[in-house]
Amino acid sequence: MSLRFVIGRAGSGKSTLCLHEVQEELKQRPRGKTILYLVPEQMTFQTQQALIGSEDVRGSIRAQVFSFSRLAWKVLQEVGGASRLHIDEAGVHMLLRKIVESRKDGLSVFQKAAEQNGFFEHLGSMIAEFKRYNVTPSNVYEMWQQLDTHSSSAEQKLLANKVYDLQLLYDDFERALIGKYLDSEDYLQLLIEKLSDSEYVKGAEIYIDGFHSFSPQELEIVRGLMRLGTRVTITLTIDEKTLAQPVNELDLFYETTLTYERIKQVAREEKIEVEKTIPLMKQPRFHSQALAHLEMHYEARPNEKFHGEASVTISTAANLRAEVEGVAREIRRLVATEDYRYRDIAVLLRNGESYYDVMRTLFTDYNIPHFIDEKRPMSHHPLVECIRSALEIISGNWRYDAVFRCVKTELLYPLDVRKEAMREEMDEFENYCLAYGVQGKRWTSEDPWMYRRYRSLDDASEMITDSEREMEEKINRLRDVVRTPVIRMQKRLKRAGTVMQMCEAVYLFLEELDVPKKLEALRIRAEESGDFLFATDHEQVWEEVMSLLDTFVEMLGEEKMSLSMFTDVMTTGLEALQFANIPPSLDQVLVANIDHSRLSDIKATFIIGVNEGVIPAAPMDEGMLSDEERNVLTAAGIELAPTTRQTLLEEQFVMYQMVTRASEKLYISCPLADEEGKTLLASSFIKKIKRMFPDVKESFITNDVNDLSRSEQLSYVATPEVTLSYVMQQLQTWKRYGFEGNLDFWWDVYNFYVTSDEWKQKSSRVLSSLFYRNRAQKLSTDVSRDLYGDTIKGSVSRMELFNRCAYAHFAQHGLSLRERDIFKLDAPDIGELFHAALKRIADKLLRENRTWADLSIKECEHLSALVIEEIAPLLQRQILLSSNRHFYLKQKLQQIIFRTSLILREHAKSSGFVPVDLEVPFGMGGTGSLPPMEFALPNGVKMEVVGRIDRVDKAEDESGTFLRIIDYKSSSKALDLTEVYYGLALQMLTYLDVVTSNAHTWMKKGSTASPAGVLYFHIHNPIVEMKGDASEEEIEKEILKKFKMKGLVLGDADVVRLMDNKLSTGSSDIISAGLKKDGSFSARSSIASEQEFNVLQKYVHHSFENIGKDITEGVIDIAPYKKGNKAACTFCNFKSVCQFDESLEDNQFRTLKDMKDSEAMEKIREEVGGE
């Protein structure tokens, strides 16, 4: 029994020496005693390849490559002890979740922390760390007692409470495992206990290679191997000079030196002979003088400079994507021109989560075979999401998001259905559920769902149509597709008495959905499309889910568990599932993490993402214990994993290992911006390399090839997939600035695409965008007629929409596009309720031959409550009755109607105008409807402007009859004559024109009426601020002022006094007008003469004629208006359709100039030729 060290700097040939010894021994004595070759888990595959890669050794039974965990399996299979069930990381997380849930009330610190993402991953890691460092639950308990006794500060008490929680959970976890289960760390402990019984290990020649340090648990295994083996050879990366000096924590080889001393100490304790150390001084790995210099002088202070051409390249990239593309281009160049194999190349990085998706896409586009040495989570696979969301449906009372997350996995679809058709139907079904607010008991009720096309309160009494009945049948059929399997599982889960029965319910749910067959179909489809990675995913995920259910049953099968806890535990397990990595092929680029990789036989290394805070890593507290807390525990005798300070000291060694992997070329790069465009800084490590290599090659990698030389541009011509985007860049440059001779080879590339049978069609779609202009072509006369008909019938709002943006009008009224309905109370719904409520009260007063002035305060309150109760069941699919929140909102709306009723009562008392009709239709047909505003357009098309007028008031005096329009608004509004001029506010003047023009037919026969004005009434329940102790009368007066109606009234003092009979001089509290002492109007009065009203009405006609002409001539310009801070696009539903973009030459706002009312009136007069 002896111990031998083989030491040397990186690249000195330590592993090569050991492998050659083993190979020579196998060649001389192929049937001798066992040879164990122990390496880190990440090195097992490549070491096995290297061991049998010699021409003289094609295979071996005598020599075996193991990691510690694989050796444990081997020994336990031989001597016994492996019969207990293995639980993987997912099983550990599930068990911990169950333990935490059952212990929750007794936890001090982790009670709330347990709900945070990643908690169980950290807790599992903490327990694994305890085991690796031989810390038992009793050790943790003793530590808690010690801390609890001596804690004085808040920080000490927090640590004591944290340690208390940890010992409780660790102890429960260990008790749950005893005699039944083994987790990954338990195998090493069992190996320590059983190793001495192994005949396989006794007398073996043992090599331990590729380690830099050992945990206490691993060190005990090394101790056991020393006792049993003939000779143990351990390789360590140490400079021989370091061993001759005192151990210094700042030394590059500090970690490996400590490991060397610890192992020698174990050998002394076990009285094992320590052979003479073999120091390796040469650098056989490096075929490049520059890389040999980098290795030899990496830690030198000051930096030793290397002059001459260096095989080191430093690149900065415009962004992360440009960096990866630069790497891909260089890899292709090495393979194409320098006789490299893909397996000779490695890409090292640290922040893989930022890079992996981009690398998979780009390396595939560049046809670079690659292997990413990183496990992917299964959490996004349809099967995992289906189980998780189905359980969430049941535990969360059938919430919309959970239901449709489950639907979108497509595993609920019948097996033989056409997926494309089913997706379309499910989209319609989802729209229905959103519009009707379907959730909770409505899913489980047997009552059929109803479908009605809802537009307004008036639709509530209409009969169901055939198309509605057909849609209703489809909706109920799809409802059963979604709910039936979930309800079956729900019933089984509720009947289940044990965890085993609950797991069985999940399994039957999957089986009844034919999930195995559906996954097989997905696998076949992935293989047919050449996506072999995802093809294996579908196989793995089913096996892993079944294994998870088996583990759940094995661990907790006979226990009783609530549905919510079962869901939490199952979800925790599902989130821990990972896809196993498929071993790399013999010729792939290896992409690996700097911290975990163990590489050999690499000629060229690309180190990417070398940004500040990433390489070297910024210190960061992670896990259950902070650095300070770990130091306290270490001082008390509990050894744990290194603190972030120790890790930071070790970072130099990690970086040394990183830059010494390659034998010929080293590439270092960093992006200057991330995927979101945020600025990133280059690492100080790059400055260090520049100091060592003053002549280093530096380059800037960009996505834009325009500024590059011809030779540099040629490197961007790679595969057809990626080159197409660069062809587009060049053509855009040519289009914008003209042809340049040094770019002529791009025309050859362009010709390849347009003549290639394979790429002609694919490229035409991309290249055609070069001439894309975001302009809407004018519709032909025929198309316009087909869309709008021979007679255009539209509301004033439609006409105003056309003037806001012609394309928005086309989208809404030509294409009939609309946003999908959502079950929520929007401003239009509230406005509709207000209108309906006030109309019902007014109708009741008309029937009783009363006015608003006749109402008492109590009657106003009673009537407001009554009409709200009548309307609530009819509004937006009974939304006001759907929840406590909406019931509260109903009460608030009733208060607003009550307040509005009081104000209308006060207005009526002060006014000579009385309502003569409400919700007056024109052009709508039926009894009581006034005729539409009709236009015969020059192209022969008829146009009718139709609508409904909120309220028409009438007053009479000796000079005649006057009519005014009142429009109820749920927000404050005034009449802006600038907006009238631009056709954005035509509604009120149209209404006034309709009622005055048709006065002879709907009032007394043959009577005429003059315009008195148009006014907006703001429906709200205002809050007023009063100074001092104000009386109730003063408060009511102030509230009345808040309801002052804005608009435009006739500039006749008598008519104004009819509107406010309390007005003598000063400003009116009711309308936006005021009188001076001499009887003239104040400057702030919104007034117009009768002649001006006539001009305005003519202008309205003029505007409609122009709008009608443009609509029928097919004008659909993408030309939204902008006026001050108002723009047509602000609340437009069609922005995603028109794709208006100000950066495009053709897309600019129509900027409208704001004007004073007098200026606007003058321009209006000019347009119609008025005087």
UniProtKB/Swiss-Prot annotation:
Pfam families: ADDB_N, PDDEXK_1, UvrD_C. One of its GO terms (molecular function) is ATP binding. Keywords: 4Fe-4S, ATP-binding, DNA damage, DNA repair, DNA-binding, Exonuclease, Helicase, Hydrolase, Iron, Iron-sulfur, Metal-binding, Nuclease, Nucleotide-binding. ATP binds at G8, R9, A10, G11, S12, G13, K14, S15. Residues 1-301 form the UvrD-like helicase ATP-binding domain. Its EC number is 3.1.-.-. The heterodimer acts as both an ATP-dependent DNA helicase and an ATP-dependent, dual-direction single-stranded exonuclease. Recognizes the chi site generating a DNA molecule suitable for the initiation of homologous recombination. The AddB subunit has 5' -> 3' nuclease activity but not helicase activity. This is ATP-dependent helicase/deoxyribonuclease subunit B. GO terms for biological process: double-strand break repair via homologous recombination. Binds 1 [4Fe-4S] cluster. It comes from the Bacteria. Its cofactor is Mg(2+); [4Fe-4S] cluster. PANTHER family: RECBCD ENZYME SUBUNIT RECC. Residues 281-587 form the UvrD-like helicase C-terminal domain. Despite having conserved helicase domains, this subunit does not have helicase activity. Heterodimer of AddA and AddB. Belongs to the helicase family. AddB/RexB type 1 subfamily. [4Fe-4S] cluster binds at C805, C1129, C1132, C1138.
